[in-house]
Amino acid sequence: MEEGGQQKGITAAFPPPPPFWKKFTPENLERLEKAKREAEPQALSRKWSPEALHALKLAPELRYLVPPELPKEGSYSLFGEAQSLSTQLPSLEEQGIEQLYPSSLTNETAGPSPDHAYYLLKISKSLLLNFLELVGILSINPEQYEPKIEDIRNLFINAHHLLNLYRPHQSRESLITMMEEQLEQAKEEIREMEQTKERVEIYLRELEAEGRNVSPNDEPVQTPESGPHNTKTQTSESQANGEQVLWKLLDKVEES
């Protein structure tokens, strides 16, 4: 099988890291922290910006440890590919790809339209039809496969682009659902606190009623068998009973 005139370069899915990763050693990190302390001994919790770190006149091997400035506009490189900072989804026409559905569906401000599902279904059926046509072409004239492969590729791109138009709407719906769950959880916690408060108030009223039945001026009846020792014993027993009531109250509150 003859190879085409143009050969595509082989690139790794995850390219190796830049060579300066070897500069990120514990010794260099300690030297960088030492340079920060020497510059401002009193500012221990300061957040250094890349511009301020570059102003410290660091050694060449320490400059690799300074993070670059965050890009504010334009694009950045990710695994060798340029990525745009703009969150707006570019249209297929801007990317030089044929668009198979009306441009009215790309209006993100109008929100999702029922037509999205209709055109997604049409694209799915077209994919099945084009696949059957591709099988027929490969069985009759395999050399004529490229146009049909391009049609299938275009259909997949349109389907993915149409699905990506749902991303803003999906994000809003996910945020609404998350906030509703947090609100319901907060309401449930408030209801549990109110129920616990009511139970505690009931227990306190019961204790108050029991305390009113006992007069503070009541003294133990002196009998021939009673004496100072027996009086102290009765007092300690009443205190112990009061403590047991309080502990039972706390146990009931915890169980409920």
Swiss-Prot record:
Intracellular or extracellular location(s): Nucleus
Alphabetical keyword list: Activator, Nucleus, Transcription, Transcription regulation
Taxonomy, superkingdom: Eukaryota
GO molecular function terms listed in the Swiss-Prot or TrEMBL record: transcription coregulator activity
Gene Ontology annotations for the cellular component aspect, listed alphabetically: core mediator complex; mediator complex
GO BP terms, alphabetized: regulation of transcription by RNA polymerase II
Residue span of region Disordered: 1-20, 208-244
UniProt-listed Pfam families: Med7
TM region positions: none
Primary location group: nucleus
Compositionally biased tracts (Polar residues): 223-242
InterPro entries on file: Med7/Med21-like, Mediatior_Med7, Mediatior_Med7_sf
Summary of subunit composition and partner proteins: Component of the Mediator complex.
Function (record text): Component of the Mediator complex, a coactivator involved in the regulated transcription of nearly all RNA polymerase II-dependent genes. Mediator functions as a bridge to convey information from gene-specific regulatory proteins to the basal RNA polymerase II transcription machinery. Mediator is recruited to promoters by direct interactions with regulatory proteins and serves as a scaffold for the assembly of a functional preinitiation complex with RNA polymerase II and the general transcription factors.
The name this protein goes by in its record: Mediator of RNA polymerase II transcription subunit 7
Organism: Coccidioides immitis (strain RS)
Gene name of the record: MED7
